[in-house]
Amino acid sequence: MRPVVRKNFLNIEELKRFLNGQTVVSIQPVTGSPLDKTDFIVAMAIAVEQAGAKALRIEGVNNVAAVSAAVTIPIIGIVKRDLPDSPIRITPFVSDVDGLANAGATVIAFDATDRTRPESRERIAQAIKNTGCFAMADCSTFEDGLWANSQGVEIVGSTLSGYVGDIEPTVPDFQLVKAFSEAGFFTMAEGRYNTPELAAKAIESGAVAVTVGSALTRLEVVTQWFNNATQVAGERKCAH
């Protein structure tokens, strides 16, 4: 595997300075949506870069390749899979890592939770190192972050907090972000940051940067948020 060229960054400290206090935009349209096409993903990537986004989170090797050719900001690349015998969805295979690296990802993120998986998380972390890309651990607990740090993973994210249990919370996990930050990790806040105020609170809690997805790039989800709120208000008005 050839080392990839890390777009504009020689080391992790440069990337950390570049992303400090910034918004990373995750562009992952709803599966099957009319917007779930590479051309639209590229268009959104260009638009958010023009608006000031400092990095992107993109799913799929083909999408990463297309977006990488169209933007100048770094890409956090992932591959999502639905496996019949494992709950791991985010970059579960070394082959996914290699594909993302060749497609132009600057950072490769993977599920760092300690669950049944097709290939060990140690193997995935090492595979990312072998490509020359930076690694990001998508974590659900502080223990996941400790493991990632012990493996030399450069970025630790709160991505999976609340998504590995039976009940999904509605608010971000600021406590996990704070714990990661206080441990000295390069912390990426991610998961349910649906307003500018919540994103700002993530930075105040110690995150270097915050990743925002649904609120910016999933029109169906945001439309439902507004519809739910206005319909409830309409029912209340009619009740009076």
Curated annotation (Swiss-Prot):
GO biological process, one term: N-acetylmannosamine catabolic process
Its EC number(s): 5.1.3.9
Keywords for this protein: Carbohydrate metabolism, Isomerase
Catalytic reaction equation(s): an N-acyl-D-glucosamine 6-phosphate = an N-acyl-D-mannosamine 6-phosphate
Molecular function GO labels: N-acylglucosamine-6-phosphate 2-epimerase activity
Record CDD domains: NanE
Short name of any one Pfam family annotated for the protein: NanE
Associated pathway: Amino-sugar metabolism; N-acetylneuraminate degradation; D-fructose 6-phosphate from N-acetylneuraminate: step 3/5
GO cellular component: cytosol
Entry superkingdom: Bacteria
Family from the record: Belongs to the NanE family.
HAMAP family: ManNAc6P_epimer
The protein's role, per its UniProt record: Converts N-acetylmannosamine-6-phosphate (ManNAc-6-P) to N-acetylglucosamine-6-phosphate (GlcNAc-6-P).
Protein name: Putative N-acetylmannosamine-6-phosphate 2-epimerase
Organism, scientific name: Vibrio cholerae serotype O1 (strain ATCC 39541 / Classical Ogawa 395 / O395)
Primary gene name: nanE
